[in-house]
Amino acid sequence: FKVNQQIGGGTWVYLGTFTFDKGRNDYGMVVLSNESKEKGVVCADAVRFGGGMGNIARGGQTSGLPRYLEGARYSAQWAGMPYSVYGGYEGKNDMNDDINVRSRTVNYLAGKSLFNPTEEGLGIPFEMSMALHSDAGFSKEDEIIGTLGIYTTNFNNGKLHAGTDRHASRDLSDILLTQLQRDIRSTFNVDWTRRSLWNRNYSETRLPAVPSTIVELLSHQNFADMRLGHDPNFKFTVGRALYKAILQYICSQHGKDYVVQPLPVSHFAIRFGQKKNTLELSWQGEEDPLEPTAKPREYIVYTRIGRGGFDNGVRVSSPSHTVKIEPGIVYSFKVTAVNRGGESFPSEILAAYKAKREKGQILIVNGFDRISGPAVIDTPDAAGFDLSQDPGVPYLYDISLCGAQQNFSRKEAGRRLGESSDEYEGMKIIGNTFDYPFVHGKAIQAAGNYSFVSCSDEAVEKGILSLEDYPIVDYILGLEKEDNSSNPARNTYYKTFSSPMQRILTSYCQSGGHLLVSGAYVGSDMDSSQGNKEFIQNILKYRHGNSLKTDGDKIAVRGLGHTFTLPRLPNEQSYPVTSPDCILPMSPAFPVMTYAIGNTPAAVAYQGNDYRTFVMGFPFESIREETSRNAIMASILRFLTTDYTD
């Protein structure tokens, strides 16, 4: 890391997120070293791990929430800002201080820099300020409210602190709204509304020393807006649009061309290499149809050994990489694309393992790509989001959920419609971590003497890997399902078994393969057409019974000599399985697991002379206890491989 110690003193400098072993140990430390070819010393007043819990007391009590969920006024105090920045109302009106402290913090951090030369401060060259808000307002006709931009010109004789005309704030606001509307309309094929540009007197656009704007992205009070707003795909599009707009603005101020960071790579796959104890990684760079400059030029491959953290990565010029490995250790990999503009979001995480005494190879296919908002209620009388049916799938995690919606009455629009409880406040709710080949792989490792590699389902569908090369295939489906109701404008396809995958799995089974499938919607997602039903009934040997409905925070499952549980409610350890599928065997298949409630089949096995299948109506990785996962995987592998003819 490069840290300029001549600016920004007296406050925290974020270095990154790192993995440490739990508890106290000899390696749980940060070492400060002065070893360098250059003159000078490295110094730090303090090192902080994590953001911590709120500790600014009011009325003798703290909030009890993580600091990142508290207001800006408390954050600024803990970050080392002077009292004049955060205490204008002397502790008597935290709300007003919270509004003003955002701008005053920017001014203090940028003080004595080129962009705020007239104020004292830390010299950090902030060039602009953007406040991202949601707005009020509602439509009883389910029309989108859309985005509003706000700026202020009538202050300080129309000048900013560096002498720049305050109309620069209008330019910034215009660029942001234009990019947002263009990208949302193009990505989701929805008529997203650009409301207007307001030249008004707001603290966050009046006080900053630099060009500033408020972006009122959408209405949190309006069902049509929030139907999009809850979708992580929408959040990514919005975030990328704002980033691109800010980049355009700053580069235009300096007369420079801009380059946008690439999109994440796709079609990621791992094979065993031609040389002994090697792995061959391959992937595909993605073009951005909305941004011609976002072309990948190079890639960074990150490696994780066992349960450790990822390394700093290896830069490669082509979409492939060969890695030497040591038998007996599980390796995990993720890939990013890079160009002059920066680094993309990471790929899904794939894992591989070479057994010391190999008796077979397994291919793990990751088909769990879904990220989604919660289930939707949309009737003439009711509107909202039903967390009890499906709380959605956050990208990695979600910190914004307060609780389940309580009021669904459309008659209450603009008043109590959308009112929620607070049981999830302060929770970091786990979503799709894109790291489940590792969970499956560790269970395979524990079963003994099986090697494995993994790949994305896109790589299989494109023919990059052939299932027939592997005697056993483990197909991860997690919470994958086709879901148009939560966001009807979504253009992403999350089918459990796509048409190409159905053909590939049919061919694999008919060639004598051994297939493990697990997912919460392997039955219900295949009820939409006769062709889908025939595939699961004739090839995978099961049919959909119903979706399990139950109360409580966990679901008990029995089978293969074990009883284990699945999480049913949002939590901080693993994604919830709200209503897994009950699947019924098609003769001569038979049930091998049951849900404790109702004693309905949870898993079905088929042992034919031609091929074998083991299908679970819940995700394997959602089994809470690792010992249970290991035991269940060992039993499944025995079933798939044992010769029962003797």
Where are the regions that the model predicts?
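Short alpha-beta junction capping motif
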Residues: 357-368, 375-387, 463-529, 607, ...
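Pro/Thr/Ser/Gly-rich low-complexity, intrinsically disordered linker/stalk tracts
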Residues: 249-293, 327, 342-360
